[in-house]
Every structure is written in C-alpha cells, then in structure tokens.
Amino acid sequence: DRWVAEAHVLRAYFYMELLKWDGPVPIEKEPYGLDYDYSTLSRPTFEDCARFIVDDCEIALQSSNLPWRLTTLNEKIRMTKGIAMAIRSEASLFAASTYNNGGKDLWEWAYTINKDCLEQLKANGYELYTKCADTEKYYNNAYMEYFTLNNYIGTDPSDKETIWQSTEGYWPDPYTNPLYDVIGAPVLGNAQLTIVPSQELVDAYDMLATGKPVLDLSKPYNDEKHLSPNYNPNSGYDPANPYKGRDPRFQATIFYNNSPVLLGKEPAVVETYVGGNSEIRTSGNTNTRTGYYWRKRMVNGNCKAAGVAGYDGRFRFYRLGKIYLNAAEAAIE
C-alpha cells in the first residue's frame, strides 16, 4: 500500500515538472506497447494535466501507511503525504493562473485545495521556522539560519518547515567545493563567481516597519536602464542608508556593502566599494559586477579564507512557507 502511494506521488511530481518546463503533456496511465503509434498522441489542456496530478496526490493521501514526514535517514529519498500536499497545492495554483487557465475561472478550486493543504500540513506537525537558535552566528535572523539547516528528518526535527529537500550538496564533495567557493564574496576566499544578485532584486525587498515597497510600483524607475529609481515616499526608505530597515529576508539572502560575516569565528564585513575586500569590478571571474553577492544557504563562518569547510544548506523543493504563499495568492484571486 505504501509503495503504491509513493508511486502515485512520484508520478505526480514528474508530471508536475514536465508541466512546468514543457507545458501540457499526454496523460498516459498504461505503458506503451512496442508497436504503439505515437502519432495518435494529443496534447491535453493545462487544466487536464493539473487535475490528473491532483488526483494522483489524492489517491496517495488515502493510504494509511504513507507517513506525513520522514523520521529516519535511511528513508531520506522516499515520498510522504507532506510532499503530496505540496504538489497538489502547486498544481492547482498553476492551473488557475491567467496564463494557464484557458479562459476558465479555476480560482475557487485552487483556493479550496490550497486551504486544505495548508490546514492539513499544519495539523500534522509542519510549522514555520521562526526562532533563530544560534542568534550570534546568524544575527538573530531565523530566515538566514533556516536555509543553512539540513535536519528536517526525524520524529521531532528542529526544522519542521521543510517538506522535501535535496539529499545531496551542490558538488560531489561539499567539503572541498562548498557554496562560498563558487558564488561567495572574495573575502570568503571564493575561487569563482557564477551568479550575482541584481539591483532590481535588491529593490524588491520591502521596508520592515511599514511593509511598503521601496519603489513606486506604478512606475518603479524613471529610465529604461533602471539607473534612476522612483522611490515610494510612504515607505520609510532612506536612500542615504539604503540597507537599513529592510525585510529581514534581504539580509539573509544577499551580501551588500558592509554586510556582517564570519570568517571562521572572526567577525568581518563584506566591502564592495572599489578597493574593498570584495570590490566591484568590470572584469575577472571572482568579483561582483553589481555590488552584491549571494548569501542564502551559506553556513556563516565556513570559508576558505579561514580554513573552515563544511556542508551548506540543501535546496528546498517544497516548504510550508511556500504553501502559505500559494494559499494567500489563491485567496486574493
């Protein structure tokens, strides 16, 4: 019974990935014969695929042997009811969007499903990670700490928010090729830089005190190149102190000029100004072009500069925070 339920969840997951990447794909419940005429296949609607995915998840959820979460590491690659709920939430929301709904109003359906998913996940032990355990290491920023954790499996894990995450690191050996080596700031001793946050991403983080956007969303910029921001006068934003008072997710995600960081156990700051320890440059493969570096999922203190290696946070496929956002979007619509 459990194996069959997991097969339904896995089929739902892979169909959802195909749907997101390639659009609607033929719905086939039986294997093809060797002489099958593939020219007879037809592409269904997005809604058809989404409902098929939701149905698979709901079949799996009926199993009394499929657990809500994994409790032992030797089952870390297996499926759960939590994963089924997350896929069910995503499939219905995507189908209801204007881009995919084919002119039909599916928001009531999506809202009903997402409300149920959120309620059942919360009732079965999932909760947001809101309290920082190591306040000194992560500056009392629970969001920063959360994405460095790799302990969501167990009967009472410290991370109860993660529904499903990668079992592997970003490289074959994360101890020799951790995140800071490929996307970190030079002050950490990075070997190369593969991505950098844009100014537009930085501008997207609201002000914490007011909850208002930094820019006037009716016209965020005064020019096509986005070099002249059009500030929201009611946000409380101070252009002379641009990083103060922002949504805490900003500090948890991005290194900016004067960001605090640990080199091993020694406190330091990231300097992105010309001449700084992680200066902005227009050439080379180690320094930012935008004045920002990626921080999310990096364990604070791990860095080549201090000779401290270790595993970073794994990529989350699904987490409760995302289900909250899905439910909120469906409710608003």
Annotate each predicted stretch with a short phrase.
Residues D1-V196, C303-L320, E333:
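Structured, solvent-exposed acidic/aromatic patches
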Residues K29-Y32, L70, A209, I254, ...:
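Solvent-exposed, flexible loop/coil residues
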Residues N65, K104-L106, N140-Y143, E161, ...:
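Intrinsically disordered regions, especially transient/low-confidence alpha-helical propensity segments
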Residues Y126-Y152, Q192-N234, I280-G284:
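Charged, glycine/proline-rich intrinsically disordered loops and linkers
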Residues T167, A204, L208, T253:
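Residues that form generic nucleotide/phosphate-binding pockets
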Residues P220-R319:
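Flexible, polar/acidic helix-loop-strand segments at domain edges
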Residues A328:
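Active-site-proximal region of nucleotide-activated glycan assembly enzymes
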